[in-house]
Amino acid sequence: MLVVEGLRAGYGKVQVLHGLDMRIEAGQLVTLIGSNGAGKTTTLRALSGMIRPESGRILLGGTDIAGMPSHAITRRGLAHSPEGRRVFSTLSVADNLVMGAFPRLTGSRPRGDVNADLDRMFTLFPRLSERRPQLAGTLSGGEQQMLAMARALMLNPDVLLLDEPSMGLSPRLVSEVFATIGRLKEAKITMLLVEQFAAAALEVADFGYVMENGRLAASGPARQLRDDPAVRAAYLGAAH
């Protein structure tokens, strides 16, 4: 479970988040939608320790992780798949996945069966299985996105943050990525999804939050938000 209380964060003197409150239950897929510049990516960066919150609490399994360095947050079980994919381009697909399990291999996370989880990733992402020895930098954009997601999953995270997984992808690859997210949901992976395609995000999610100018403007079950006239007009391309 991830609980956010009164989160304020920004960059230097520019405050982006103004007292954010959110809750993600175990096994739940929650989406955060909003226009560009609303503060969605900043939210994920604050949760994962990429930027330090100014105030507020971030409770991961009951422990306040606000202000911890990102590596410490990762060890506590929060994995972040950031926008832009950011794979290790000079490493193979298989080695990228092993890097995702690094906290487990060094004893800072429960080790479990890393090899079995590698096989599980290759089953979940069959295209990656076909490219195990290939350098990550030579993969297509869609394949790199799948690799970034799979690498984050190799942590065996308690919570997975996904930032714009469809960014820059063709419609066909967007469909593949969302099909994969659907399979992760079926596996009861706890996820917070930030996504530019609000309709697709609300279709797959259990619950949603709508962000405007660093504040939450609406929240509710995803189906309810999909049917809300104001949300449809603002984010789903539908008229009142």
Residue ranges of predicted features:
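Conserved ABC ATPase signature
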Residues: L135-L139, E143
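ABC ATPase NBD coupling module
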Residues: R52, D64-R85, S89, S108-L118, ...
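ABC ATPase C-loop
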Residues: A152-L153
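The feature captures the beta-strand-to-loop junction immediately N-terminal to the Walker
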Residues: I33-S35
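ABC-type ATPase nucleotide-binding domains, specifically the catalytic core motifs of the NBD
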Residues: G12, M68, V93-D113, L124-P126, ...
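Helix-to-loop junction immediately C-terminal to a conserved catalytic motif
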Residues: S48
